UniProtKB/Swiss-Prot annotation:
Belongs to the universal ribosomal protein uS15 family. It comes from the Bacteria. One of the primary rRNA binding proteins, it binds directly to 16S rRNA where it helps nucleate assembly of the platform of the 30S subunit by binding and bridging several RNA helices of the 16S rRNA. Forms an intersubunit bridge (bridge B4) with the 23S rRNA of the 50S subunit in the ribosome. One of its GO terms (molecular function) is structural constituent of ribosome. One of its GO terms (biological process) is translation. Keywords: Ribonucleoprotein, Ribosomal protein, RNA-binding, rRNA-binding. Residues 11-22 have a biased composition (Polar residues). Residues 1-10 have a biased composition (Basic and acidic residues). Residues 1-22 are annotated as: Disordered. It comes from Synechococcus sp. (strain RCC307). HAMAP family: Ribosomal_uS15_B. This is Small ribosomal subunit protein uS15.
Amino acid sequence: MPLNTEKKQELINSHQTHATDTGSVEVQVAMLSERITQLTGHLQSNKHDYSSRQGLMKMLGRRKSLLGYLKSQSSERYDTLIQKLGIRG
């Protein structure tokens, strides 16, 4: 379930650090969080979709490691991102 182009551009615009930023940690975590939210909804209605569940676990691990990196680099950026996305840190 990839993100559609409009949603992806909206996420990039709301989390980018400068005008041409598309790959910063904040943008990557925001896109992963959106995909995790979509996949969680899919798995609530399709409980036996084990391959999607495995993909969800990979995404959660990737987001966790990116957040750990961001926290080690700048705790202020980490805190604002956590609040903006509404996720647990």
